[in-house]
């Protein structure tokens, strides 16, 4: 259902730039699951896109100290010098990328970074190449900014990764950006240096195309996978690459709302113009906390990633043991993206035929009280996403319920 359909009854006519944007399937499922919980039903919600760990104590203490120092006023528009220096050092230390402070921007979450970049660069009809499955906001942000999302299906047969052949075929004179996310939400797929190389070679041939990389799940990778970011791999693309990151996932700071990016000075300046007329500066207290996160101890990241890996293994093994489901092993993030084509056309105990991944997920919620998200919400069917950012006990119970639900299909 689109925005137009939901608000016209109230006599309000939405702007055309948002009229085609639908209400998030994730939000609808979450609302239904929450309502069922309020009714006393034992719902297990596996849709959360945030870590279940707490923000580290030293980060919380830094925020408290900032408050007591009176650092509760406006800051510089796109980030304090202290935070920009911490980000610069992080990029150099962990990614081998060198940026000046005026090539770094800070915003109220990585989502605002993406919005600022698209708003600052897209003219009506400009195209943005987005591999599917994709994080749901990518396409909507492009549309709000009057760009045209070019969605390229990348299913399990390609490891949910874009290929050079598909990228080359998608590029036109109107292409402005290619958007890549590694590790990916929702698939958990990640690009190695070898995976990136053919894509970067394609981009080198098309100097009018810029690259936006979302590295938010950088620190959550498994099985000795070596994370790498494209601007390091190909210096020839650095002057048209925006490298996006944030503190939300690695440091369990989703509610602190700090995202950041490094990129060409002219783009960063244009993004600041957009931000100046939107939110102005990010939260001063959150910025102080983020300095502590980036500059402070990082050893806890390994322990948390090991915990996520145990859960990943539990979920992947459990799903692959269920007839009709097929789950690829993700390289990172905290999601599985399982195929469910094997249950298509089967019939539920109530007599409803499963025609889509949306039907399957609705069945799991209503029949077994397990909330997962259909692949259609991420632009690729028939799949469903599970977030394993919850306890192993809850994951085991959810897998038992999903298995039992599949056995009841005829």
Swiss-Prot record:
Null mutant phenotype reads:
Insertion mutant is prototroph and is able to carry out symbiotic nitrogen fixation.
Supply one GO BP term.
amino acid metabolic process
- Where does it primarily localize? cytoplasm
Q: What class of enzyme is it?
A: transferase
pH dependence, record text: Optimum pH is 8.0-8.5.
* Similarity-based family: Belongs to the class-I pyridoxal-phosphate-dependent aminotransferase family.
Functional note: Catalyzes the reversible conversion of aspartate and 2-oxoglutarate to glutamate and oxaloacetate.
Protein name listed in UniProt: Aspartate aminotransferase
Organism name: Rhizobium meliloti
């Amino acid at each position: 259902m689109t925005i137009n359909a939901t608000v016209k009854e109230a006599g309000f006519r939405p702007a055309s730039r948002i009229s085609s944007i639908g209400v998030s399937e994730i939000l609808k499922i979450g609302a239904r699951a929450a309502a069922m919980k309020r009714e006393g039903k034992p719902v297990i919600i596996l849709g959360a896109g945030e870590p279940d760990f707490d923000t580290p104590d030293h980060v919380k203490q830094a925020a408290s100290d900032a408050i007591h120092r009176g650092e509760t006023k406006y800051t510089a528009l796109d980030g304090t010098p202290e935070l920009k220096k911490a980000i610069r050092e992080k990029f150099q230390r962990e990614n081998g990328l060198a940026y000046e402070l005026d090539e770094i921007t800070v915003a109220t979450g990585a989502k605002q970074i993406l919005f600022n970049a698209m708003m600052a660069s897209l003219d009506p009809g400009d195209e943005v190449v987005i591999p599917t499955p994709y994080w749901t906001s990518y396409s909507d942000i492009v549309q709000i900014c009057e760009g045209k999302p070019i969605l390229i299906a990348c299913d399990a047969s390609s490891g949910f990764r874009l290929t050079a052949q598909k990228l080359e075929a998608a590029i036109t004179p109107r292409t402005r950006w290619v958007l890549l996310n590694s590790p990916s939400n929702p698939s958990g797929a990640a690009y190695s240096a070898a995976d990136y190389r053919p894509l970067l070679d394609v981009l080198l041939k098309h100097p009018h195309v810029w690259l936006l990389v979302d590295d938010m799940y950088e620190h959550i990778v498994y099985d000795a996978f070596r994370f790498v970011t494209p601007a390091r791999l190909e210096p020839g693309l650095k002057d048209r690459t925006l490298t996006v990151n944030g503190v939300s996932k690695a440091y369990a700071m989703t509610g602190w709302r700090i995202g950041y990016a490094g990129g060409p000075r002219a783009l960063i300046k244009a993004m600041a113009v957009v931000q100046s007329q939107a939110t102005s500066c990010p939260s001063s207290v959150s910025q102080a906390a983020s300095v502590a996160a980036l500059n402070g101890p990082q050893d806890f990241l390994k322990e948390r990633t090991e915990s996520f890996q145990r859960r990943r293994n539990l979920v992947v093994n459990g799903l692959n043991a269920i007839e009709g489901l097929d789950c690829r092993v993700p390289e990172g993030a905290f999601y599985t993206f399982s195929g469910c084509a094997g249950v298509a056309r089967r019939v539920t105990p109530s007599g409803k035929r499963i025609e889509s991944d949306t039907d399957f997920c609705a069945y799991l919620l209503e029949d077994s009280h397990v909330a997962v998200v259909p692949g259609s919400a991420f632009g690729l069917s028939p799949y469903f996403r599970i977030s394993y950012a919850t306890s192993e006990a809850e994951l085991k119970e959810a897998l038992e319920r999903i298995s039992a639900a599949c056995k009841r299909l005829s």
